Amino acid sequence: MKNLDKLIESLKAELGENLTSVIAFGSKANVEDAKNNLNLMIVTNTLNAENLYAISKPIQKWVKAKNPIPVVMNRDEWYSSFDVYAIEYADIKENYRLIYGEDLIPTIFVDKHFLRLECETEIKSLLLKYKNNFILNIKSDKEIKRF
């Protein structure tokens, strides 16, 4: 995990005490020697343009090593997003590994109401895309009989 160690050291150097947590999540969160495609969440106390610029180079190197761009947010965004990203937070809570700093995962509370709303939104969005794709690609009434 050479790339991960380098990233953490760079984040600590650039953000100092402002770096709250680095959390791995997703399917490779608990794979000890994951070489790439490791999802990370970086949480800071405050986040502004200067902070984003400071961490841009290390994150660009991380992405160049075939990793997804980390989710970067401040502490306020972390606590105010449980309703909007209910599915994502529920997934993170089930499969994560604290890489650095404070373990914020126990603070996650996903209300079932918001989880249902996000699931419904996702399903309805997919249904709309499916219908639009059907409308744009149907060539004859014979094709309808296949459905």
Where are the regions a protein language model picked out?
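Residue-identity detector for threonine
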Residues: 20, 44-46, 107, 121
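Residues immediately flanking
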Residues: 27, 44-46, 96, 102
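Conserved NTP/Mg2+-binding pocket subregion across the NTase superfamily
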Residues: 59-146
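Metal-dependent nucleotidyltransferase catalytic core
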Residues: 1-16, 30-36, 40-85
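Short gly/ser-rich loop at a beta-strand->alpha-helix junction or flexible surface loop bordering the NTP-binding
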Residues: 20-28
